[in-house]
Regions:
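N-terminal strand-loop-strand
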Residues: 1-24, 28-29, 50-51, 74-76
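Short, well-structured beta-strand/strand-turn elements
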Residues: 48-57
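Active-site-adjacent beta-strand/loop module that shapes the phosphate/pyrophosphate-binding cleft
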Residues: 60-85
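Hydrophobic alpha-helical positions that pack around
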Residues: 25, 39, 43
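Nudix hydrolase/Nudix homology domain
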Residues: 18-22, 85-137
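Surface-exposed, charge/polar-rich loops and edge strands
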Residues: 33
Length: 137
């Protein structure tokens, strides 16, 4: 789930990630929960950021642990981050231009994003190309 605030998006990193790699936040649906509600809950749990609008982007099969990844965009309704340090090592807002550099492996400080085998790569790519208009489909 890629949380957007205009020209910025929220990315986080887990301790086991490759050095310098950031990704969109992620989580699992709970029984009886809609995908949209899961996005709002997971973002709130991991970064304490409230989300308003949620828009479905795509799905992608994921073999570990036999899951279906559901890619969504979400509009941030606040931007103050409080990181859940059990879930994440860090979370921060990145400019769209920074994300483009991360995808191209040209970020000034060597930060990177997941490769094309992961749905988050495609979420980030769509955001770089279309900006916040990805929320309108």
């Amino acid at each position: 789930m890629l949380v957007i605030d205009g020209e910025r998006c929220l990315l986080g990193r887990q301790r086991h990630f490759a050095p310098g790699m950031y990704s969109a936040l992620a989580g699992f649906l709970e029984p009886g929960e809609t995908a949209e509600d899961a996005v709002r809950r997971e973002v709130m749990e991991e970064a304490r950021v409230k989300c308003a609008q949620v828009a479905y982007f795509a799905s992608h099969p994921w073999p570990f642990p036999s899951s279906l990844m559901i890619g969504c965009f979400a509009q941030a309704s606040d931007t103050d981050i409080v990181v859940d340090t059990v879930e994440l090592e860090d979370a921060r807002w990145f400019l769209r231009s920074e994300v483009a550099a991360m995808l191209a492996a040209t970020h000034a400080t060597g930060l990177s994003a997941p490769k094309p085998f992961a749905i988050v790569h495609h979420l980030l790519q769509a955001y770089v190309v279309k900006g916040a208009s990805v929320l309108s489909g």
